């Protein structure tokens, strides 16, 4: 897929108007948006950025500035505010409509109009999972930034296991805050779109003396999957949730989630 160049927007400017606790407000840098979204075919899609103030959101600006190159059909954006507006861009004209509420939970009718929700919701498990759940209810896809701990929640894990939710292609852990500071956070891209990642290889051969067995499951413990996962082992392996970032569904199956015990 074509790699889209940065627009003239400063990558250090804030990228989304989120709501929730002020400590949850981490704004996405444009370079991270470009890096991840270049992996998806968005041609003919209507995008909804539902936690994004159009005047400052790097998500909205990226889609608006690359509307024709991406082949988009439409672009919506809404945000939390006492007097919110819904922005719509069709490639040539931008219009605004007053909303009764900026909370994405109250704007299901707008979500029904889109194909994919792409945003950075407030950094809390409940917000991210609620957004995924809502999009699933309306039959819409998501590409969002969310906490790594999403994978530990039963409902979300079941979606991961059934290939209904995947970790994205690129890493993302540096953000800007309302005060202008740069912060790091344990986050990932999450999407309900099926990913197509290359087979994962470390070049490591299995040696039983190098791996401990779990006491509570018939699996070997993989401490650092990027360095220790053996290419020639075909039994069960216990890996951290971060392994989802390199998961190829044709290479590995997700079986279950456990809290490993090794005595």
Q: What is each PLM-predicted segment?
A:
Residues 1-263:
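Class I S-adenosyl-L-methionine-dependent methyltransferase catalytic core
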């Amino acid at each position: 897929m074509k790699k889209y160049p940065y627009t003239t927007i400063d990558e250090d400017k804030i990228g989304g108007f989120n709501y929730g606790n002020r400590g949850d407000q981490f704004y996405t840098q444009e370079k991270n948006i470009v890096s991840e979204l270049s992996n998806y075919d968005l041609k003919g899609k209507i995008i909804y950025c539902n936690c994004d103030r159009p005047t400052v959101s790097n998500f909205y600006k990226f889609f608006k500035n690359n509307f024709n190159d991406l082949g988009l059909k439409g672009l919506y954006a809404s945000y939390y505010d006492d007097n919110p507006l819904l922005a719509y861009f069709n490639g040539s004209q931008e219009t605004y409509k007053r909303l009764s509420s900026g909370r994405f939970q109250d704007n299901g009718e707008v979500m029904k109009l889109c194909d994919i929700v792409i945003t950075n919701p407030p950094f809390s498990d409940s917000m991210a999972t609620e957004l995924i759940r809502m999009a699933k209810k309306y039959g819409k896809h998501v590409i969002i930034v969310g906490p790594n701990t999403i994978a530990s929640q039963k409902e979300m894990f079941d979606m991961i296991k059934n290939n209904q939710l995947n970790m994205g292609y690129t890493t993302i852990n540096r953000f800007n805050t309302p005060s202008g500071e740069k912060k790091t956070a344990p986050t990932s891209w999450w999407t309900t779109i099926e990913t197509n990642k290359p087979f994962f290889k470390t070049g490591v051969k299995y040696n039983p003396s190098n791996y401990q067995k779990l006491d509570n499951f018939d699996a070997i413990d993989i401490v650092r999957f990027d360095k220790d996962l053996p290419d020639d082992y075909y039994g069960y392996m216990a890996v951290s949730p971060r392994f989802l970032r390199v998961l190829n569904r044709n290479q590995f199956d997700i079986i279950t989630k456990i809290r490993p015990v090794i005595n």
